Amino acid sequence: MGLLLRSALFKYIIIVLIMLNLRGYVLAEQEQGSQIPLEEIIQVGVTRNKIMTAQYECYQKIMQEPANGKEGHFCNRTWDGWLCWGDVSAGVISEQRCPDYFQDFDPSEKVTKECGKNGHWFRHPDSNRTWTNYTRCNTFTHEKVKTALNLYYLTIIGHGLSIASLLISLGIFFYFKNLSCQRITLHKNLFFSFVCNSIITIISLSAVANNQALVATNPVSCKISQFIHLYLMGCNYFWMLCEGIYLHTLIVVAVFAEKQHLMWYYLLGWGFPLIPACIHAVARSLYYNDNCWISSETHLLYIIHGPICAALLVNLFFLLNIVRVLITKLKVTHQAESNLYMKAVRATLILVPLLGIEFVLFPWKPEGRIAEEIYDYVMHILMHYQGLLVATIFCFFNGEVQAVLKRHWNQYKIQFGSSFAHSEGLRSASYTVSSISEIQGTTYTHDYSEQSNGKNCHDMENVFFKTEKQYM
């Protein structure tokens, strides 16, 4: 009973001291309030709150942990003003991560505290007071700020290029009606998910990275934007999975699917990613409710990354099985259609490892300043240039798209040439019109058959319905 009373009294004393300390800070702020900007006051308040919370938790830990039962000299557990230190054997240098109280402190660096051989904490010779070595916390701050700024601009440029290339690709798909088919519809949804993700990423980075006061106040809107970002990131990968499932159904089980129902793809691509995003939001608010949910130092991110990795693995399995079937068909029948499908599969097969490698590298962040910097640059390129990569492979390198663009470009050149010839008066109007009509018809037929072997998007989807099951 006496022990409980003493513990409660000690807690009360700690709380009173903290409150008195806080009152002194508030009075000092009121005296100088007219001179200090609001953003700095908010930041200082957040820093003090973190320190006082850590101080209270440290005193709780000091009281509740059992006494050190080891033999020999040791340094007693203590609070040094910023960090909590446990019992340390004599002659040992204890270390832990730097705190994140201040903007110029790097939490990835280490703080050290030396326990002397006599069982007393090291005292600094200048002040003769116990001393903790925090010097490494801001030794490389300037270099890391430069790196962070470079990564910020790299990210913004990557998403800007992604948005531009994806919008151009969507314009091509919507403008040229002869490209319309179910596979292109899946491409459109995939591209749109990447556009939305890039837009929300740029908005979030512009608002958060340049506004520490916003992060300090921790508004709900900040967390909502992070929730939307994680949801859209999931949509990117599940629409990639839809691409793989569609091709697998079309090529491997085409006998059972004359026309696929896209509603299931919409549910998988737009609906399913809501589940892990909502679970992550609830778990984050309960177990790791950091400001704006921007920290990556939590295993709760695997709630998002786990389903994405599963989608990538399933997609890879489907694509490898498709390649097996196509190779079998090529060996037996030497069909030209199999070559066309192989080109379509090859694009997806290239993208899946490129989009998934970031999740392979994510848990393996190396130690060391230079290695970490290289890792950060590689990860940012892999993560933030995905939209540009998707648009390039699925649209700009697409043979059908290139054939359509070339055909329309040739038509434009012919029409422009006819207008120029007409203005010069080189031919009569009737002769010019009839000649151009003949040339246009000839150009259209020759160019398209040469590029696509006489097959369009719908032909490619339907050709495998006619193949024999023995090659499956």
From Swiss-Prot:
GO terms for cellular component: plasma membrane. InterPro entries: GPCR_2, GPCR_2-like_7TM, GPCR_2_calcitonin_rcpt_fam, GPCR_2_CGRP1_rcpt, GPCR_2_extracell_dom_sf, GPCR_2_extracellular_dom, GPCR_2_secretin-like, GPCR_2_secretin-like_CS. One of its GO terms (biological process) is cell surface receptor signaling pathway. It is a multi-pass membrane protein. Disulfide bonds join 58-84, 75-115, 98-137. Glycans are attached at residues 76, 128, 133. Keywords: Cell membrane, Disulfide bond, G-protein coupled receptor, Glycoprotein, Membrane, Receptor, Signal, Transducer, Transmembrane, Transmembrane helix. It is found in: Cell membrane. It comes from the Eukaryota. GO terms for molecular function: calcitonin receptor activity. SMART domains: HormR. SUPFAM superfamilies: Family A G protein-coupled receptor-like, Hormone receptor domain. The chain crosses the membrane at residues 150-174, 186-208, 220-248, 263-283, 300-324, 340-361, 377-397. Residues 29-149, 209-219, 284-299, 362-376 are extracellular. Residues 1-28 form the signal peptide. The keyword Transmembrane helix applies. Residues 175-185, 249-262, 325-339, 398-472 are cytoplasmic. PROSITE patterns: G_PROTEIN_RECEP_F2_1, G_PROTEIN_RECEP_F2_2, G_PROTEIN_RECEP_F2_3, G_PROTEIN_RECEP_F2_4. PANTHER family: CALCITONIN GENE-RELATED PEPTIDE TYPE 1 RECEPTOR, PDF RECEPTOR-LIKE PROTEIN-RELATED. May function as G protein-coupled receptor for calcitonin-gene-related peptides and adrenomedullin. Specificity may be modulated by accessory proteins. May activate cAMP-dependent pathway. Belongs to the G-protein coupled receptor 2 family. This is Calcitonin gene-related peptide type 1 receptor. It comes from Xenopus tropicalis.
